[in-house]
Amino acid sequence: WWGPGYGGYGPGYGSGLGDAFSDMFGDGYGDFNFGMSGGG
């Protein structure tokens, strides 16, 4: 599912079946502040 990703350089929370990399590297496919962990 789609969840909020906190910080572009910190941990991303919420990504389930989206992208594990966004979750680990902190919303790498979204914004640098607040985005969607799992895409963008």
From Swiss-Prot:
InterPro entries: SGP. Pfam families: SGP. The protein envelope of the sulfur globules is composed of the three different proteins TR0, TR1 and TR2. Structural protein of the sulfur globules, which are intracellular globules that serve for sulfur storage in purple sulfur bacteria. To C.vinosum CV1 and CV2. This is Sulfur globule protein TR0.
